[in-house]
Amino acid sequence: MAQKISKWKKFKRFLKRNMTPTWAKHFSYQVFAFLTSVAMIVGVADYAVTKSYAERKLTLMDDFTITAHTGAFDTEMNTIDFVKAAIKNKAKVIELDIRQRPDKTVVMSHDLVVTNNDATELEEALKLIKDVPDMKINFDIKETRVLNSLHALLVDYNLIDRSFLTGIEVINVKAVKESNCANMDYYLNYTPSKFRAFSDDYRQKIIKLLEDTGAIGINCNYKFAGGQLSNLLHKKGYKLSVWTVDSQRNAKKMLVIKPDNITTKNPEMIKEVISNWGK
């Protein structure tokens, strides 16, 4: 039985037989022209979409906040340098990733902490934040076993009322409710569907989920947030938080749907977009 020749091999044989210098030059020009045309179309479309967002009237929620993502202001994530930079730049909300060491010391870390020397102790950050009365803290909970120890620290530094939790998945809700953090505000980390948000059944499912969990709203990647979801949540008294918005185009896309919070590694960029809106 003759071996089957793949389409790719057939194409290479065709090129070998027919690729004269003149033909190759003409073919290369066509490919270049095609790619250039595609790039121009994408660029024009991107400009048009961005401009259309900027032409809309901008209204923000009364309690709208910008959270400085850990590592913002050109610092290392979950470090004292980040906390100091956030204070210096007058961030209203800062995000800290929370875990604990094997000895149960609460630390700031995105990744798993395996020794008692890893990561920076959260208490070092709280000592600085407690003296900045208008700063709130977004604690991104990476493991729920840390909740009781975290709560104890917040009580010690009188920061309960200035703190809220994110990173809480549906499977983590039971642990939150059974912890000392049960009465703290928290957003439910969830991946909503922008398309199903038009369905009454799906909309009812979202609201029931929030009612059952006790969350104050949904925290999601900005790619999954849309106007339908935002309107639904606000109509029912819930909030919408989006992450991580780091470009002007995405900032404009998100601002028009009126989230309650935007988490970003570039807070100044978000402020500039708001200040220059419509100009």
What are these regions (language model features)?
Residues 2-279:
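Phosphate-group recognition and catalysis centered on beta-loop-alpha active-site segments
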